[in-house]
Amino acid sequence: MKRERFKPPEPDDPLCCCGDIDQQREYCCCDCEELDDACERLLRGEPDKPDVFSRFISRMADRLGVSCCTVGPLRLELSVLPPMVLIPGLLRVAAINCLLGVIILTALPLLVLWYYYMTHRRKRRTLFFLSLALFSLAYMYYLFLTEIVPRGDVTHLQVVTATTGMMLTLISLVRTKQGPGFVKSQSLALGINSSLATNRSTNLTLDTDLRNGVSHLKGEKDVKKKCPVCQLVRPPRAGHCRICGACVLRMDHHCVWINSCVGQANHRQFILTLLLFLLTSFYGISLVLRSICPKQSLFTAMLYCPGVYNQYSTALCFTCVWYSVIITGGLLHLFILQIINVSCNVTEREAQIALRNKTGRRRFCGLVVETGDHSRGFLQNWIQFLTMNMDEIGSSLNLTDMV
């Protein structure tokens, strides 16, 4: 017997969960017909479509709003909650003994990588990584003030230095979040006219190219391509971010740790944020190790610190040191790649495209990707990076831009 299809609900039907449904079904909690089919497949033991319940959960999460009279409606992003619960709990469990510490500190990066590839495959924005970074920084600073400072091994100047480093890192992060510089239709029209006038001139100099962030040969015409998604003619080295849904000027990559793209307007500030974080992290790790393992050198104390598990407070600090080392190591790798790319005048997007098209080559164990398109030498590449045009920088930052 063929099952009768689910009929659309009446407007006054109080039992329907859909509410008002428009043509795109953007105001419904779920698709009743899809949910009915999913339940029937579940009762029959048949494999379900993978996106049915994920879309239902995502749509329910999107509809959980928090009203605020000053900043307007804010959506409640559920991905910010797990780091606030898991980080303190897992680190305190890992501090019980050495075996638990090894297991948890090994599994935690693997879980983060798995979640990254899951969200990267779905091309969706998430606040999980930004929440993880900010809460880890705040929790490490909290333990530093409550566990290390009362021991009396840290001077007031060292506390002020560590606090200043953390504040400078947060300020630099806020400036990085102001925007990567998106391609805009009005400014693009002005840019096309300026480019056409420049192409008519045969006296094109390198200094002009460096100031505009575009390197090409003398008298060479700019190649402008139309974005198939935005339907905008984008300037050279711009790229479309499928996560942000916009074209970014001189796009480098979409960084999940700041939940934003890195482009022409914030690339320098992004590298500065990484540098400040690394310096502050290394300094904080050295202060903690000197306090809990005063008789050992810094490198020896990380591997061998006698009696560190005799007290739970010292064991917790030692576990947090290793947690900080793991995070710092990952960001140090990112920082080194950024320095190499700037030195070669290549963005991460251009490097990936060159490798995919087999037009670039790897050197030095894959750290360097040579494309041969924009490099003018080490010194000139850095001059271009430090003086490139910032006319397309984002507007002033507001509270909603932080997420």
From Swiss-Prot:
Q: What enzyme category does the UniProt record give?
A: transferase
What catalytic activity is recorded?
Answer: L-cysteinyl-[protein] + hexadecanoyl-CoA = S-hexadecanoyl-L-cysteinyl-[protein] + CoA
Q: Name one GO molecular function term.
A: protein-cysteine S-palmitoyltransferase activity
Query: Is ATP-binding included in the keywords of this UniProt record?
Result: no
Q: Which residues cross the membrane?
A: 71-91, 93-113, 126-146, 154-174, 269-289, 320-340
Give the bilayer topology.
Multi-pass membrane protein
PANTHER family the record matches = PALMITOYLTRANSFERASE ZDHHC23, ZINC FINGER DHHC DOMAIN CONTAINING PROTEIN
Q: What is known of its domains?
A: The DHHC domain is required for palmitoyltransferase activity.
What name does this protein carry? Answer: Palmitoyltransferase ZDHHC23-A
